[in-house]
Amino acid sequence: MSTKNFRVSDGDWICPDKKCGNVNFARRTSCNRCGREKTTEAKMMKAGGTEIGKTLAEKSRGLFSANDWQCKTCSNVNWARRSECNMCNTPKYAKLEERTGYGGGFNERENVEYIEREESDGEYDEFGRKKKKYRGKAVGPASILKEVEDKESEGEEEDEDEDLSKYKLDEDEDEDDADLSKYNLDASEEEDSNKKKSNRRSRSKSRSSHSRSSSRSSSPSSSRSRSRSRSRSSSSSQSRSRSSSRERSRSRGSKSRSSSRSHRGSSSPRKRSYSSSSSSPERNRKRSRSRSSSSGDRKKRRTRSRSPESQVIGENTKQP
């Protein structure tokens, strides 16, 4: 069969023998070249495109021939001599890939592998972590635990039974039983009593000297305080005398003012009578108004009532 007239259709298979590699029709059960039977290992062929045929070639008016093929993925029409599509590089004849579903494609969940896990009552779980109920507890057979405890107790007893001579524990007792005559304990007591007496005497002397110095230091301070008190008393007496003199002068001034006012009041009718007799009635009115403005409304009334009387008195005085 010539390669030009060879056409691959769906279902054709390739011989599983690597040396042979012959492409057989889908209807054959054994290889046409080597005679090997068809097995599951044989890879199926898949056509990436189909020939357009004579009808479409005639419609193209000489642009395409009947052997040209159309791609199945992008529907581009390619020449017959091309083994791959000119647009998407899809092969004209390709091997059919096995669809296992592990890559996320078609038939993904058909053959699912389940991992069987057995729940055990052991100390650790499937991830190697210690279970909560076994945390903080010694897990193991009772016999093993007893053996461990027995070994620990035996080790402690052996440690206690070891030779203790190297530690020299009796040296303290020997030191307590030693001769204490060389230390003179009575002499130390006498020295302590003498020291206490001398300390008391020195304290009494220091207190007496301190009292004397304090009395001496207090004497100039007391004299200063006395002088200050005297100066304060003298200043207070002077201020009092000044205040009393001021009060006396003020009282005298007030008395003199009152007496002068009384004298003025007594002499006013005479002056008014003389002035009224000598001056005109207009002047008397002006004077009475000026006096009434200074003394108040009551004085105005008095001056008005007295003005005609003063004129009568003046006339009477003129006549002998």
Curated annotation (Swiss-Prot):
InterPro entries from the UniProt entry: Znf_RanBP2, Znf_RanBP2_sf, ZRANB2
Modified residues (N6-acetyllysine): 18, 54, 92
Zinc finger residue ranges, RanBP2-type: 9-40, 65-94
Molecular-function GO terms, alphabetical: lipopolysaccharide binding; RNA binding; zinc ion binding
Segments for region (Required for nuclear targeting): 151-320
Superkingdom per UniProt: Eukaryota
Composition-biased stretches (Acidic residues): 150-163
Disordered, as annotated region: 117-320
Record key words, sorted: Acetylation, Metal-binding, mRNA processing, mRNA splicing, Nucleus, Phosphoprotein, Repeat, RNA-binding, Zinc, Zinc-finger
Gene Ontology CC, one term: nucleus
Secretion signal, residue range per the UniProt entry: none
Compositionally skewed regions (Low complexity) per UniProt: 211-224, 232-242
One Gene Ontology biological process: mRNA processing
Primary role: Splice factor required for alternative splicing of TRA2B/SFRS10 transcripts. Binds to ssRNA containing the consensus sequence 5'-AGGUAA-3'. May interfere with constitutive 5'-splice site selection.
Record-stated family: Belongs to the ZRANB2 family.
Protein name per the record: Zinc finger Ran-binding domain-containing protein 2
